[in-house]
From Swiss-Prot:
Keywords: Ribonucleoprotein, Ribosomal protein. NCBIfam families: L27 (TIGR00062). The keyword Chloroplast does not apply. Pfam families: Ribosomal_L27. GO terms for molecular function: structural constituent of ribosome. PANTHER family: LARGE RIBOSOMAL SUBUNIT PROTEIN BL27M, RIBOSOMAL PROTEIN L27. Belongs to the bacterial ribosomal protein bL27 family. InterPro entries: Ribosomal_bL27 (IPR001684), Ribosomal_bL27_CS (IPR018261). It comes from Geobacter metallireducens (strain ATCC 53774 / DSM 7210 / GS-15). Residues 1-22 are annotated as: Disordered. GO terms for cellular component: cytosolic large ribosomal subunit. This is Large ribosomal subunit protein bL27. HAMAP family: Ribosomal_bL27 (MF_00539). One of its GO terms (biological process) is translation.
Length: 85
């Protein structure tokens, strides 16, 4: 019998920190200018009306209003912010 534990168990046990990507504000929610709406890697969702896109593809509101997710053609999505009436 071996008197030392197998080396395999000590080589495991690493994992990367989660990046907290995804939707931060949902359709119909009120947002203020500058609020982050969606964090993503690449353009899963494209910026629509009154929505800006950061260098890491983060979508954010340019005006105060209400979030609306829409289709952009057949196979794309976009998010827009419309003024609350």
């Amino acid at each position: 019998m071996a008197h030392k534990k197998g080396v395999g168990s000590t080589r495991n046990g690493r994992d990367s920190e989660s990046k907290r990507l995804g939707c931060k504000k949902y359709g119909g929610e009120n947002v203020k200018a500058g609020n982050i709406i969606y964090r993503q890697r690449g353009t899963q969702i494209h910026p629509g009306t009154n929505v800006g896109c950061g260098k890491d593809y983060t979508l954010f509101a340019l005006i105060d209003g209400v979030v609306k997710f829409e289709r952009l053609g057949r196979d794309r999505k976009k998010v827009s912010v419309y003024p609350a009436s």
